[in-house]
């Protein structure tokens, strides 16, 4: 998992360098981004490698500080608003996590996970449920598990493409990883497993219904991010070797897929001038490579065979069927519905943004009609004869309407050689080779995950076995089967 996360982070870093070199904006200086990005990646690595709760907390706090800087970089109103939401929610999670660590230490005298694997089981059941609840809520906020996920779709889309990509790919997965460690090492077979199953089902369905309702590519991807967290929580909550193996494999798969799709969304915004699906059109004709870069990870996200997304989902659904309970079968049905609705959401973007003719876009006609209605509504009434001032106002309004139509035509044009018009506002920007190259490399990584699915799933099976049997972990920590 750490290898996949590091590889993805490198791709995002190259993408960001290319974007910074192409734009050269003083509002988002590359020097600040690069330094903060490295701190963020260090926090991710610290969280993945932590062997005790306090070091895990430190990793989360490193992530929090760096992610807030990255989220608000540029200082626009939308980013500040999204950053405030993010920081309030994250601080709430951190305070709850720190309080749980204090209670754990007071009850057991340690925060070492290998020791806690034994000592927490000696506590009264009520104390175990309280501590498990506090940790699950804290980690559920960070992983965006429903009903603790409302903050994510409002915060992530406001950030620049590389920031959103690394947030979607890594930060939520750190929360999922913490849930894996909590459920398997500290509270195996805990009293809240059934509740976690229902939370997984709600996360899948609520997230994907939100994605289907979106008309903006970034917001749609943010909601699919939430919904597919549900698949991972599903496997964790089953508590079986097959379920955990599917969850571990799906986490690694989703890190690569979701990061790649958000980078593609950044390229779409540069090529089309917007991420609104209703304003886009003809991208496949203008940039066939961009169409391929979207199509491959989008189909992988939807779980089209034989891609790695299909393999991961089949593994999770098989684990649910093997578990055999009514709740598990309900989640299997929910997983199938979520996959189909994911296909619907990405297919709509594919057909509208990439293949629809720009002339079919309703935006220009709607904008022109609204401008004309406003002009009529605010036109001074007279005896039917316009004064010179009124004529000038009318000419100004006409010029503004013409300029808006030219801008919309440029932003939704299917051909790069659109004849220039005087005063046209060209929103389109070329795609720098560095950005395209980094995205292409990550798409290749998602394809490689499919080719290497067999060996990777074998590693996931081994990890699941080690998670269920805690003896190898405690022995490796203390050098003996006796836990001090």
Give the location of each predicted region:
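Hydrophobic H-region at the start of alpha-helical membrane spans
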Residues: 2-4, 90-94, 436-440
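Core segments of transmembrane alpha-helices
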Residues: 5-6, 171-175, 312-313, 438-443
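Cytoplasmic juxtamembrane regions at transmembrane-helix boundaries
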Residues: 15-31, 163, 365-369, 424-434
């Amino acid at each position: 998992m750490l290898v996949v996360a590091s590889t993805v982070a490198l791709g995002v870093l190259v993408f960001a360098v290319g974007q910074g070199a192409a734009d050269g904006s003083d509002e988002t200086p590359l020097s600040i981004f690069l330094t903060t990005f490295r701190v963020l990646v260090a926090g991710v690595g610290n969280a993945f490698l932590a062997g005790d709760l306090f070091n895990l907390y430190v990793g989360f706090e490193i992530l929090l500080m760096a992610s807030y800087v990255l989220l608000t970089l540029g200082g626009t109103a939308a980013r500040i608003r999204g950053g405030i939401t993010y920081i309030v929610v994250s601080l709430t999670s951190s305070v709850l996590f720190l309080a749980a660590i204090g209670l754990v230490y007071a009850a057991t005298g340690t925060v070492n996970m290998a020791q806690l694997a034994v000592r927490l089981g000696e506590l009264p059941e009520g104390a175990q449920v309280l501590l498990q609840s506090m940790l699950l809520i804290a980690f559920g906020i960070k992983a965006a598990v429903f009903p603790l996920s409302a903050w994510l779709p409002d915060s992530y889309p406001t950030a620049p493409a590389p920031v959103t990509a690394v947030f979607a790919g890594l930060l939520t997965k750190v929360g999922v990883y913490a849930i894996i460690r909590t459920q398997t090492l500290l509270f195996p077979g805990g009293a809240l497993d059934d509740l976690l199953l229902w939370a997984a089902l709600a996360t899948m369905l609520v997230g994907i219904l939100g994605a289907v309702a979106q008309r903006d590519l970034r917001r749609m991807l943010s909601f699919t991010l939430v919904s597919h967290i549900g698949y991972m929580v599903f496997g964790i909550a089953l508590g079986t070797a097959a379920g955990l193996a599917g969850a571990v494999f799906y986490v690694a798969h989703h890190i690569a897929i979701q990061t790649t799709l958000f980078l593609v969304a950044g390229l779409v915004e540069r090529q089309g001038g917007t991420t609104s699906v209703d304003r886009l059109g003809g991208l496949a004709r203008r940039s066939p490579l961009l169409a391929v870069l979207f199509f491959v990870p989008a189909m992988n996200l939807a779980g089209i065979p034989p891609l790695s997304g299909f393999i991961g989902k089949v593994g999770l659904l098989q684990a649910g069927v093997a578990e055999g309970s009514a709740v598990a079968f309900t989640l299997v049905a929910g997983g199938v519905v979520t996959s189909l609705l994911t296909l619907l959401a990405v297919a709509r973007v594919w057909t509208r943004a990439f293949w629809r003719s720009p002339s079919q876009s309703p935006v220009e006609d709607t904008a022109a009609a609204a401008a004309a209605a406003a002009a009529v509504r605010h036109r001074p009434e007279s005896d039917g004869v316009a004064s010179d001032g009124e004529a000038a106002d009318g000419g100004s309004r006409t010029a503004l309407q013409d300029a808006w139509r030219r801008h919309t035509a440029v932003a939704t044009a299917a051909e790069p050689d659109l004849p220039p018009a005087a005063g046209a506002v060209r929103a389109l920007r070329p795609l720098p080779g560095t950005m395209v190259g980094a995205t292409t490399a990550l798409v290749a990584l998602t394809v490689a995950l499919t080719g290497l699915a067999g060996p990777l799933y074998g590693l996931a099976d081994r990890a699941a076995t080690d998670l269920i049997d805690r003896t190898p972990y405690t022995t490796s920590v203390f050098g003996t089967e006796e836990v001090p």
